[in-house]
């Protein structure tokens, strides 16, 4: 039943409920009408029946009735007269079927004495006057009421073999007011059920016709009233299929106004769809621009990483070259110590130089060769330091490139932040990533500045080393000239020992200066080693930072790609609606 009810349309449910309500109302009204009709009919019938009973009673001689009641068998003549009166009343009153008289007192069995019967009744029943007869219960109920009220009463409608009757009981009283007999008249009551049946049939016909008419009227009214709902259902079906090009007919009644609300909702929904389409297109365009920007940023970061790798390789190469420089400088220092010792020895044996001129000439040649070695070593060291100066300038140029790239990265991060802010809520994640990129760019710029400062210090130290090397080179050249002069005038050594001794002292002094300069060179080279080590560590840190920045840029690219995919999917979903 419940499933069947859910399958019915709203119109069918409404009509069915209306029919049930009408049936309930009409049934209630019919029951009330039938009850009123029955009460009215029974009231009329009772009044007519009592009038009939009074008529029968008036035709009888109550004195004769009282006498016959005393002994129905002995009072034969009076009983015959009484029978004639009963027959006369039965013939005159068409509604009376039979009349009879019973005694007022019951015997031990509850039976009443039959005083007299009308002829028609006597021919039908077996009981005779003077005999006792057990009356039906409903008859006895009316009898009890007559005996208690001492007034006429009637039974309810009943049926027997002779028909449908209502018995009127009229009491016969003596002089003291005691009931001595009861005159009973069976009034034909067949009209009562037949009238009820006709009333019921007519009522049912009226109910059916009324329900049919009311159902048809209700069906037409409800169908017309629910027409907007049918339109609304069709509209909802089309909207569910994605068709927004629909406008329902509007009416001013309570149900018709729903269609106007539906039309307004569709118009607003179409506006929302259009705005969402525009927003999706803007998001798609912005995501593509962000993707291009991230690709450019990624390429820039890769270039920075490549430059930092080259810078770190150069710094490592410089760091590995420094020990070689130190070896050469240490060797020069050892040679200068030997020269100093030799000068001292020459000073001691200057007095005997004439005797060792051959040895002196050899020593002079050896000094010349040694000075050539020193000059070559100083020139090599000068070339190395000059190369270091050139490398430092190249590193400075690279740092400038890093600073420029960091500025570009910062600009790209700012541009990504602006684009993310345009995307509102969906761009919050991109704004965070862009901010992280900007911070990394600022850190990289700061690191580049630190590197530039270190390189500046290195260049300053390198320039000082170049000045010292140039000074040492000049001193070596002076020593060479002195040694050559010593060789040229070696033959005159024996003649000018004192002059040689003085020159040896000068050479010893110059050797001490050269030794001191060599020690300064060692210190500068050690500083260069520390600087190269610092370059290596800094470049490693910058390289790691740039790799992290590259990963961040890749994350931004992935997010931009995801955003582009989401915007395309949103456009596909919105494309299902026809606006």
Swiss-Prot record:
It is found in: Cell membrane. Residues 293-529 form the Methyl-accepting transducer domain. The chain crosses the membrane at residues 14-34, 199-219. The modification Glutamate methyl ester (Glu) is found at residues 289, 548. CDD domains: HAMP, MCP_signal, PDC1_HK_sensor. GO terms for molecular function: transmembrane signaling receptor activity. It is a multi-pass membrane protein. Residues 223-274 form the HAMP domain. GO terms for cellular component: plasma membrane. InterPro entries: Chemotax_Me-accpt_rcpt, HAMP_dom, MCPsignal_dom. Residues 1-13, 220-579 are cytoplasmic. Residues 35-198 are extracellular. Its main location: membrane. PANTHER family: METHYL-ACCEPTING CHEMOTAXIS PROTEIN MCPB. Chemotactic-signal transducers respond to changes in the concentration of attractants and repellents in the environment, transduce a signal from the outside to the inside of the cell, and facilitate sensory adaptation through the variation of the level of methylation. Belongs to the methyl-accepting chemotaxis (MCP) protein family. This is Probable methyl-accepting chemotaxis protein BT9727_0355. The lineage of its organism: Bacteria, Bacillati, Bacillota, Bacilli, Bacillales.
């Amino acid at each position: 039943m419940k499933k069947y009810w859910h399958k019915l349309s709203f119109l069918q449910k409404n009509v069915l409920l209306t029919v049930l309500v009408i049936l309930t109302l009409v049934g209630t009204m019919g029951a009330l009408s039938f009850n009123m009709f029955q009460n009215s009919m029974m009231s009329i019938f009772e009044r007519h029946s009592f009038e009939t009973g009074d008529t029968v009673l008036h035709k009888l001689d109550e004195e004769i009735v009282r006498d016959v009641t005393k002994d129905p068998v002995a009072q034969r003549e009076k009983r015959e007269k009484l029978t004639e009166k009963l027959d006369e009343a039965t013939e005159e009153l068409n509604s009376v079927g039979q009349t009879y008289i019973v005694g007022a007192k019951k015997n031990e069995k509850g039976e009443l004495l039959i005083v007299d019967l009308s002829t028609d009744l006597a021919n039908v029943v077996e009981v005779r006057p003077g005999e006792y007869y057990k009356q039906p219960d409903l008859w006895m109920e009316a009898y009890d009421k007559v005996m208690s009220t001492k007034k006429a009463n009637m039974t309810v409608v009943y049926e027997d073999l002779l028909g449908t009757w209502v018995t009127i009981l009229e009491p016969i009283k003596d002089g003291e007011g005691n009931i001595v007999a009861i005159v009973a008249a069976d009034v034909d009551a067949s009209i009562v059920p037949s009238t009820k049946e006709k009333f019921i049939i007519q009522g049912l016909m009226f109910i059916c016709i009324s329900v049919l008419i009311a159902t048809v009227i209700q069906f037409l009214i409800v169908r017309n009233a629910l027409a907007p709902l049918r339109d609304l259902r069709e509209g909802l079906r089309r909207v569910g299929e994605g068709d927004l090009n629909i406008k329902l007919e509007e009416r001013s009644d309570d149900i018709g106004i729903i269609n106007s609300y539906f039309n307004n909702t569709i118009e607003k929904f179409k506006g929302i769809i259009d705005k969402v389409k525009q927003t999706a297109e803007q998001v798609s365009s912005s995501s593509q621009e962000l993707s291009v920007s991230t690709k450019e940023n990624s390429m820039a970061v890769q270039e920075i990483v490549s430059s930092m790798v080259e810078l770190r390789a150069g710094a490592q190469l410089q760091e590995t070259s420094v020990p070689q420089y130190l070896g050469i400088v240490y060797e020069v220092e050892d040679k200068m110590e030997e020269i100093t010792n030799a000068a001292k020895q020459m000073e001691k044996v200057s007095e005997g130089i004439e005797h060792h001129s051959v040895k002196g000439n050899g020593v002079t040649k050896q000094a010349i060769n040694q000075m050539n070695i020193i000059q070559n070593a100083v020139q090599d060291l000068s070339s190395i330091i000059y190369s270091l100066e050139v490398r430092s300038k190249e590193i400075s140029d690279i740092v400038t490139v890093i600073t420029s790239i960091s500025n570009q990265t910062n600009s790209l991060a700012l541009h990504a932040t602006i684009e993310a802010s345009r995307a509102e809520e969906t761009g919050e994640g991109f704004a965070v990533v862009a901010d992280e990129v900007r911070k990394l760019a600022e850190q990289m710029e700061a690191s580049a500045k630190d590197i530039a400062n270190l390189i500046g210090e290195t260049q300053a130290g390198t320039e000082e080393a170049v000045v010292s090397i140039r000074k040492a080179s000049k001193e070596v050249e002076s020593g060479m000239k002195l040694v050559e002069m010593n060789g040229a005038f070696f033959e005159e050594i024996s003649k000018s020992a004192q002059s040689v001794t003085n020159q040896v002292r000068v050479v010893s002094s110059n050797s001490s200066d050269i030794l001191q300069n060599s020690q300064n060179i060692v210190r500068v080279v050690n500083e260069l080693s520390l600087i190269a080590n610092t370059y290596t560590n800094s470049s490693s840190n910058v390289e790691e930072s740039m790799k992290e920045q590259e990963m961040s840029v890749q994350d931004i690219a992935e997010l931009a790609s995801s955003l582009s995919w989401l915007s395309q999917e949103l456009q596909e979903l919105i494309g299902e609606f026809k606006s």
